[in-house]
Regions:
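General secondary-structure edge motif
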Residues: 2-3, 32, 39, 76
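Hydrophobic pocket/interface hotspot
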Residues: 10, 22-23, 30, 48, ...
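A solvent-exposed, acidic/Ser-Thr-rich amphipathic alpha-helical stretch
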Residues: 19-21, 27-71
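A beta-strand edge to alpha-helix "cap/lid" segment located at domain peripheries
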Residues: 53, 57-113
Length: 113
């Protein structure tokens, strides 16, 4: 898998605010973890693309100026880490694990406080 190309497509999808485009990178049974989800949905672990769609829809609504700039891409075995900055210059990292079909099956987001 070309992780650098994935990161470029991931950044472009997020910056488009097109949920279908964003979710196109994720498997139906994806597991997503983020402390930021606690504020919007009451828990930090989401299961399935529908739950992720509901969360990200609320997140995009709450931050209409949301944008990401990829800082670095770290390659692993069947996984990667994308470090990026958002529109407020907050550093974050997302660890993505991929299934055999190239879709994200597990994702964890961490943010600078």
């Amino acid at each position: 898998m070309d992780y650098d190309a994935f990161a470029i497509a991931w950044e472009a999808a997020w910056n488009s605010h097109d949920l279908d485009r964003i979710l196109g990178h994720y498997a139906e049974d994806v597991v997503f973890r983020s402390q930021k989800a606690m504020r919007l949905v009451g828990h930090g672990e989401l299961h399935g693309k529908a739950a992720l769609c509901a969360y990200w829809s609320r997140a995009l609504e709450a931050q209409p100026d949301l944008s990401f700039i990829v800082v670095d891409v770290l390659h692993g075995h069947g996984m990667m880490v994308i470090t990026y900055r958002n529109q407020r210059d907050v550093l974050a990292a997302e660890t993505l694990r991929f299934g055999a079909d190239g879709l994200v099956v597990e994702a964890s987001a961490c943010h600078k406080p």
